[in-house]
Amino acid sequence: LLSTAVFASAVTGLQAQNSLTIEQVKDGLYTISGSGGNVGVRVTTEGVILIDDKFPQDFAEIQELVSQVSDQPVKYVLNTHHHGDHSGGNIEYINISEIIAHQNARDNMLRGNQDAPPRLVFTDQTAIYLGGVEVRAFYMGRGHTNGDAVVYFPDLQTVHGGDLLHTIAPFIDYANGGSSKGWVSTM
C-alpha cells in the first residue's frame, strides 16, 4: 500500500518559499506544497475533499489553487491531526465545509484553544463518499500525536500520512500523546 504512492507532509525545498504550489499526484489527486504540512486535494464531480488546510493566511491561496484544478467547491476538510499547519485553516473552512478529524485531534484542538475544531469526529475509521469517490481515514494508533489520521484513496491506491511521514526523521509530539514506540507500530 505504502509502496504504490505516498505523499507526506515533509519539508522540501518548495516549502521554503513563501508561496504555495499545486502538483498532480494522480488523476484527480493533487498536493499543495509550501510552508508547513502538505494539503491533499481530491477532486470529484460533486466537490473537493481537502486533506488538511494549512494556516489561516493560506486560505485564499489554497482556494485559488483548487480553482485551477476544479470548478467545484471544497465540501470536506479532513484534518490529519491538530497542529496549526494542518488545521489552522479550519477557521476559514468551518462555515463552508464539513471538517472531520480523529476524536483525539479534536480534543487536542480544544485543549489548545484552537479555532474551529471539527464538528465531525471518528475513533477508528471513517469514510467520505462524494461524486462516486471514496476517501477513507484510519486511526492506526499513537505516533506523531495521539490523534493522527492516515487517509487512503482506494481507487488510486494512494495514502496521505500527514506528519506520520517525514523525509528526514519523525517528529514526535509527546505533549499531545505522541509516542516513538507507537510511531513504529503505526508505521
Predicted segments with their positions:
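Active-site environment of divalent metal-dependent phosphoester hydrolases
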Residues: 58-59, 82-88, 106-110, 145-147, ...
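Active-site metal-binding motif and surrounding structural segment of the metallo-beta-lactamase
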Residues: 45-49, 57-100
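Divalent metal-coordination and catalytic microenvironments
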Residues: 28, 42, 52, 66, ...
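Metallo-beta-lactamase
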Residues: 24, 47-50, 55-57, 103-143, 145-147, 154-156, ...
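Boundary of Sec targeting at the N-terminus
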Residues: 16-17
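Conserved beta-strand hairpin/beta-sheet module of binuclear metal-dependent hydrolase folds
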Residues: 20-65, 149-153, 157-163
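Bacterial N-terminal signal peptides
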Residues: 1-13
